Amino acid sequence: MLGTISMRFFATKVVAPRASVAASTPQVPLGMNINPYAMFIKENFKANTSDMKRTDLMKELSGKWKALSISEKDKYTELSKNYNAQKLDDFMKLSTEEQKKLVDSAKEKKAERASRRHAKERREKRKQSGRPSVPPSAYALFIKEKLSGAGMESKEKMKEAVAQWKAFTDSQKKKYTDEAKKLKDEYHVVLQKWEAEQKENADQ
């Protein structure tokens, strides 16, 4: 069953207030507002009780949205308008310091998402090129072992694993550092072979 979907998933890009707004109006956080389509998705995600994969459900809901009439979409336009107005009202009631914290936090989260997206793109590019994958670190090996079969409790187990790793002595970490070193050495051998093959192909 699908888990709870964060509001970030439905958020649309929010820019600084328009010039017509009073100069004293602060910048609102990126992603604070959601559009009618996102409101439709949000509502139907909550109503869904199937085991359908999120990507498949999104594809299905996208098709349903396109099939809605203008009058049917008006419902979500109104919901979106009311939601955004309430969010802005709540935001404006905060102190300047609290507003700034929310704006800065939203920017940091956006940067983190962009960083993860770029990292994923690099991994996919490496995979397509046939470049050997960088082996996991000792810490990553430990976390993977601890989270194996974690299921729905993965978040709690992750917290426990992180705390446990931090409390480990060097001797307790040795099993994982030795394995990581072995994998790293093997990686360099395979990488050198791959790079040599790439150079040979380029020279032909």
Curated annotation (Swiss-Prot):
Q: Which Pfam families match?
A: HMG_box, HMG_box_2
Disulfide bonds, paired cysteine numbers? none
Residue ranges of DNA binding: 30-95, 132-195
What outcome is recorded for mutants in which this gene has been deleted? RNAi-mediated knockdown results in reduced mitochondrial DNA (mtDNA) copy number.
Basic and acidic residues: compositionally biased ranges = 102-114
Which Gene Ontology terms describe the biological processes this protein takes part in? mitochondrial DNA metabolic process; regulation of transcription by RNA polymerase II
Per UniProt, which keywords does this protein have?
Chromosome, DNA-binding, Mitochondrion, Mitochondrion nucleoid, Nucleus, Telomere, Transit peptide
* Transit peptide: first to last position: 1-10
Specify residue ranges for compositional bias: Basic residues: 115-129
According to the UniProt entry, its GO molecular function terms are: DNA binding; DNA binding, bending; identical protein binding; telomeric DNA binding
- Compartments reported by the entry: Mitochondrion; Mitochondrion matrix, Mitochondrion nucleoid; Nucleus; Chromosome, Telomere
Q: Where is this region: Disordered?
A: 102-138
> What does the record note on quaternary structure?
Self-associates.
As for what it does, the entry says:
Binds to mitochondrial DNA (mtDNA) and plays a role in the maintenance of mtDNA levels. May also associate with telomeric DNA, binding to at least two telomeric repeats of the sequence 5'-TTTAGGG-3'.
- How is this protein named in the record? HMG box-containing protein 5
List the source organism.
Caenorhabditis elegans
